[in-house]
């Protein structure tokens, strides 16, 4: 399955929430897309509910099925609560950390910045969006990229105290992952236990 590149409002309406951020269309059309969307609210099977939750997580973090499955398998083999570890692994992805630091306005934009070699980790360019950032590592903007309009606009007025597991130095345009976030601190509306149940079937 390729990464979805179509209208984000369509996906937001599918799940009934703005999984990509604030969505003006969703506030007007809070029902599934399609010709009969306003009349299509129907009971979903147990499997359908679990599958939808997995899709929501994949769309939210912009992860493909193979990557998502690999992250789940690693989480399942680790000590701790599988669903929480899965979300923590998604939060540790470099593209997500770039987004959380306010360097990019969306995760999709963050992926582009990483892929186009605008982002550094501990001073070295890393162009792999799925790179897992470890606590203590420094994520920054490459010197020649600091004047990019998309970065400047995204950082302007961004509240860097939103996420207590991250630290930001405005003067040098670098951030640090202080620690892996607790589940209660992760703001995404994802029922990870349903994903665990789906993969356990």
UniProtKB/Swiss-Prot annotation:
SMART domains: Ribosomal_S4 (SM01390), S4 (SM00363). GO terms for molecular function: rRNA binding; structural constituent of ribosome. The keyword Zinc-finger does not apply. Residues 92-155 form the S4 RNA-binding domain. It comes from the Bacteria. Part of the 30S ribosomal subunit. Contacts protein S5. The interaction surface between S4 and S5 is involved in control of translational fidelity. This is Small ribosomal subunit protein uS4.
């Amino acid at each position: 399955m390729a990464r979805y590149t179509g209208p984000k409002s369509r996906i937001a309406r599918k799940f009934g929430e703005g999984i990509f951020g604030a969505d003006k269309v969703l506030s007007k059309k809070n029902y599934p897309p399609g010709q009969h969307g306003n009349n299509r609210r129907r009971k979903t099977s147990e499997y359908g509910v679990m599958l939808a939750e997995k899709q929501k997580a994949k769309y939210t973090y912009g992860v493909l099925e193979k990557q998502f499955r690999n992250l789940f398998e690693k989480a399942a083999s680790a000590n701790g609560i599988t669903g929480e570890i899965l979300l923590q692994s998604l939060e540790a992805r470099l593209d997500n950390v770039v987004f959380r630091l306010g360097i990019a306005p969306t995760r999709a934009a963050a992926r582009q910045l990483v892929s186009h070699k605008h982002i550094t980790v501990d001073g070295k360019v890393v162009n792999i969006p799925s790179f897992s950032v470890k606590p203590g590592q420094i994520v920054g903007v490459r010197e020649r990229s600091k004047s990019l309009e998309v970065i400047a606009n995204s950082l302007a007025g961004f509240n860097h105290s939103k996420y207590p597991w991250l630290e930001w130095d405005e003067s040098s345009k670098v951030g640090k992952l202080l620690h892996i976030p607790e589940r209660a601190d992760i703001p995404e509306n994802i029922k990870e236990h349903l994903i665990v149940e789906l993969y356990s079937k």
